[in-house]
């Protein structure tokens, strides 16, 4: 695994949240950034997932962000609905 690997997930609904959880539990990245137009959902999903992975041996940093975070992202997942 590359160090400091950032994954940005656009869309904090069911698909984006489950994708973030799977990535967290498989120790694939160091940081997961949620982006969603519903800022309350974005924040609550990030907080819930951060609580879920808190006791993992190497839990990623989970936070909310904006589209500038996509610039240095290693992977961008688009899970936003149409």
For each feature predicted by the language model, list its residue ranges.
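Glycine-rich Rossmann-fold phosphate-binding loop(s) that bind the pyrophosphate
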Residues: 12-13
């Amino acid at each position: 695994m590359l160090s400091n690997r950032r994954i940005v997930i656009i869309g904090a609904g069911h698909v984006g949240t489950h994708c973030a959880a799977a990535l967290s539990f498989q120790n694939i990245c160091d940081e997961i950034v949620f982006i969603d137009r519903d800022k309350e959902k974005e924040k609550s999903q990030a907080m819930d997932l951060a609580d879920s992975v808190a006791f993992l041996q190497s839990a990623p940093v989970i936070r909310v962000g904006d589209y500038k975070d996509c610039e240095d992202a290693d992977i961008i997942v688009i899970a936003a609905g149409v």
